From Swiss-Prot:
SUPFAM superfamilies to which the protein is assigned, alphabetical: GatB/YqeY motif, Glutamine synthetase/guanido kinase
Annotated coiled-coil segments of the chain: none
Organism: Rhodopseudomonas palustris (strain BisA53)
Entry EC number(s): 6.3.5.-
Protein name: Aspartyl/glutamyl-tRNA(Asn/Gln) amidotransferase subunit B
Length: 494
């Protein structure tokens, strides 16, 4: 799907270059109030076994009933991934034993998933982009959780998570580096958050990835892959891929063979370790669940959901660039999180959605607001400066009431103390000096006091900046910068 891997992206080994091939299975918890086949709550953080129905506990005679909202969320996600929506899909039993799986099988989808092939366009940190194919998206139940730290000799089972709806989003093996993998998961998480189908909170386990890694000589046949299970942070995904690729290359260069297996990533050591041999589909004895009819819906149902989808990040980025003249980089920063884009749009709305304000507003949102939020470790929901307040600061700059320097002082006051920016400018005497006579007097005084600097500036015009700085300093930053520049050019004969 993508161009051949650049030499700089290959991994150098003792016997030459190697290409890493990566596919990801991302498990995204569906944003819904109830579980996939029961009415039990999906609330995070409850006491162990507080949110367990008789269905979740697999009590005899209890039958699953599909949660329509989970189906709708899966369809919305498929539409957001530009994927084929299958109007008929089937739930299957995936048979295996584990203590946190009370049924003795997981209800999943095997041959007939609800969503088919799609594609995600991914922007990379180096400015390039790749297309990552989506193989499928299917719905399945999550398992419970084993608690090993509650008793010295026993393991307890918490079934709060048992039966929670997951979307397993399976990519094609189109990814060729750890950086690409991290960028793909970041983009996927952004899309899910825009859609409102998953909160993407990796710390709570709402989004986790199984990472399939193999290596080969560039352009050669695919190698034997190993699967790294349940990696729960984007940074760890990158580290796991880097380690696993090096491990496999080392084995192959020593004349060994890669064993297909499931591995775990040890975040403390930054390495993967063997967990078990890798199962194939036939090991799970898939068959259609006899308790559930095939899932069928109409194209009208799909169209109704599609009509209500929000504007997604790629479309929003393109609109920001077209309507407000933003650079690709600035537009990308603003749409990376839905809340960031909404804040920027709220600033623009307060300014009347004028295209002329787009760049200045973006500059203040990205550099001043985001910069300060990052410095203090806050997210945008906790910003002390509201969109309306920031819009007023931008408006004051645009109309020439305050200079950029004064605006930064004003932003600091609003951040620390709050208040209406326009009133603060009035009460604290922060208005920009636009009286040419007053500015000219300051300019004349500085020129007369520095005849040596005048000669230097006339010989080297770039030194006029020194005079600009002195005038701004003398005026307390209130002099209109354009007026200062015009007067100095005239009086210095530049």
């Amino acid at each position: 799907m993508n161009a051949p891997v650049k030499p700089s992206k290959l991994i150098k080994g003792a016997t030459g270059d190697w290409e890493v091939v990566i596919g990801l299975e991302v498990h995204a918890q569906v944003a819904s109030n109830a579980k996939l086949f029961s009415g039990a709550s999906t609330e995070f953080g409850g006491a162990p076994n507080a949110h367990v129905s008789l269905v979740d506990a697999a009590m005899p005679g209890m039958l699953p009933v599909i949660n329509e909202e989970c189906v709708a969320q899966a369809v919305r996600t498929g539409l957001g991934l530009n994927a084929q929506i299958n109007l008929r899909s089937v739930f299957d039993r995936k048979n295996y034993f584990y203590p946190d799986l009370p049924q003795g099988y997981q209800i999943s989808q095997y041959k007939s998933p609800v969503v088919g092939e799609g594609v995600v366009e991914v922007d990379l940190p180096d400015g390039e982009g790749i297309s990552v194919g989506i193989e499928r998206l299917h719905l399945e139940q999550d398992a419970g959780k084993l608690l090993h730290d509650q008793h010295p000799t026993s393991t307890f089972v918490d079934l709060n998570r048992s039966g929670v709806a997951l979307m397993e989003i399976v990519s094609k093996p189109d990814i060729r580096s750890s950086e690409q993998a991290k960028a793909y998961v970041s983009k996927l998480r952004t899309i899910l958050r825009y859609l409102g189908t998953c909160d993407g909170d990796m710390e709570k386990g709402s989004l986790r990835a199984d990472v399939n890694v193999s290596v080969r000589k560039p352009g050669g046949p695919l190698g034997t892959r190993c699967e790294i299970k349940n990696v729960n942070s984007i940074r760890f995904i990158g580290q796991a891929i880097e380690y696993e690729a090096r491990r496999q290359i080392g084995i192959l260069e020593d004349g060994g063979a890669i064993v297909q297996e499931t591995r775990l990533f040890d975040a403390g050591k930054g390495e993967t370790r063997s967990m078990r041999s890798k199962e194939e589909a036939h090991d799970y004895r898939y068959f259609p669940d006899p308790d559930l009819l095939p899932l069928e819906f109409s194209q009208d149902y799909v169209d109704a959901l599609k009509a209500k989808l929000p504007e997604l990040p790629d479309a929003k980025k393109a609109r920001f660039m077209a309507e407000f003249g933003l650079s690709l980089e600035d537009a990308g920063v603003l749409v990376a999180e839905r809340e960031s884009a909404e804040f920027y749009e709220a600033v623009l709305a307060a300014l009347g959605n004028q295209p002329r304000d787009g760049k200045l507003a973006a500059n203040w949102v990205i550099n001043e607001l985001f910069g300060r939020l990052n410095k203090e470790g806050r997210d945008i929901a906790a910003s002390p400066v509201s969109a309306a307040q920031l819009a007023t600061i931008v408006e004051l700059i645009g109309e020439g009431t305050i200079s950029g320097k004064i605006a930064k002082d004003l932003f600091e006051i609003v951040w620390c103390e709050g208040g209406d920016p326009r009133e603060l400018v009035e009460t604290r005497g922060m208005k920009q000096v636009t009286d040419l006579g007053a500015i000219e007097k300051v300019v004349d005084d500085i020129i007369q006091a520095n005849p040596d600097k005048v000669a230097q500036a006339q010989a080297k015009p770039a030194l006029m900046g020194w005079f600009v700085g002195q005038v701004m300093k003398s005026s307390g930053g209130k002099a209109n910068p354009q007026s200062v520049n015009d007067l100095l050019k005239s009086k210095l004969g530049l």
